[in-house]
């Protein structure tokens, strides 16, 4: 039987996004009421950071913990030690509360580069990284994933994402080709892959052996077309609904 989980970001609990946040208890209650099997951790500090307290909250709702996004800055080697500490903090929480099948989701800090934020959904080849930048990003990802595996036994996945340096199908494929398949897989996001110029079904087939985690997200082609026509940036595209409710877009689930 296929089981589906959710994440606090569906309730607006996510970095870079302003607005009212409900408490974690409400989020977990509504996940349980909707019939989800589990949850991602969400931003550090949103849910209890004490493992025993978090375990109690999940168990009384019969929810499983399965993964957590951690924002990293792979393009900036000076920030790698701090990123490593953040990743390990989250990985230890996941391992203790969720168990050995949990996954750390690396997300390269979205919407921080002006060009990549502005050109989301219409990335051109000359918008990409240099050879040296590619090595910096992939070496950093490998280092973090190996540290997580060594210290906690957990595996790590990387989330391709609009408004970052790894958005398009070609960039996603190159990232995977330059990283260690023993410790680092892909968090495949159907909506981001589609808005980034790809066909999600083809993406799943192409990267099946590296996809260890999936984010189901739909994509509204009409909003995407307006974004490209009017030059919206990534944040405005999201605000205007480029990632629509499941079933209302063009992703063939």
Question: PLM ranges: what are they?
Answer:
Residues 6, 38-39, 138-244:
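Acidic/histidine-rich catalytic cores of soluble enzymes
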Residues 10-12, 43-45, 71-74, 108-112, ...:
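Active-site-proximal loop/turn and secondary-structure-junction residues that shape catalytic pockets
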Residues 18-23, 111-122, 224-236:
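Short, flexible, mixed-charge acidic loops at enzyme active sites
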Residues 48, 77, 165-166, 194-197, ...:
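Loop/helix-junction capping segments adjacent to catalytic residues or to phosphate/diphosphate-binding pockets
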Residues 64, 79-186:
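Active-site acidic/histidine proton-transfer and metal-coordination neighborhood
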Residues 68, 106-107, 214:
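Short glycine/serine/threonine-enriched helix-capping/active-site loop
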